[in-house]
């Protein structure tokens, strides 16, 4: 639900899963066949996992990080992992790159540029749940285009500030 001032978008677990399923249908509807999925950790891990299961494709993971200040709302320096993690083999063929959103577009553009330099990748497309109007990168597949740039409150963010002590309090009788 988008707030009246357009600055915040709150997403429930049910909405989140429905959006990932809609993303899967968009990808399937395109008719594009791909060999592997590369998800960006952390935001792309949940969508990547679901898409890996739905399409029955191997899942690789690349860690990225850019949100640093102001409770994670101010983008800082972009860090890309040196290595891509996958169970076997190498990242090769037709790759679907998955993240949760294209915010500024900086992360996706940097990863795409890096992947295009890998000779083992023959084709690359990208998929996200949300893309913002301010993004400098437009993914091949997305579910919602947000004309403004709201902060998206995803359902798993409740764990960002939850520590074991707080979790234990939930189960005290």
Annotate the PLM regions.
Residues 1-173:
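PRPP-associated nucleotide enzymes
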């Amino acid at each position: 639900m988008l707030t009246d001032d357009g600055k915040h978008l709150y997403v429930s677990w049910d909405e989140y899963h429905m959006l990932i399923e809609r993303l899967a249908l968009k990808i399937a509807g395109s008719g594009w066949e791909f060999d592997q999925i590369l998800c960006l950790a952390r935001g792309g891990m949940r969508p990547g996992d679901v898409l890996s299961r739905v399409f029955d494709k191997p899942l690789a993971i690349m860690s990225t990080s850019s949100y640093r200040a102001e409770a994670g709302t101010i983008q800082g320096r972009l860090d890309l992992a040196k290595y891509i993690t996958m169970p076997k083999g190498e990242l090769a063929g037709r790759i679907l790159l998955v993240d949760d959103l294209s915010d500024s577009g900086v992360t996706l553009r940097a990863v795409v540029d890096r992947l295009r330099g890998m000779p083992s990748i023959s084709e690359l497309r990208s998929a996200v749940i949300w893309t913002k109007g301010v993004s400098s990168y437009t993914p091949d597949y997305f579910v919602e285009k947000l004309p403004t740039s709201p902060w998206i409150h995803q359902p798993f963010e409740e764990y960002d500030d939850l520590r074991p002590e707080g979790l234990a309090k939930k189960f005290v009788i």
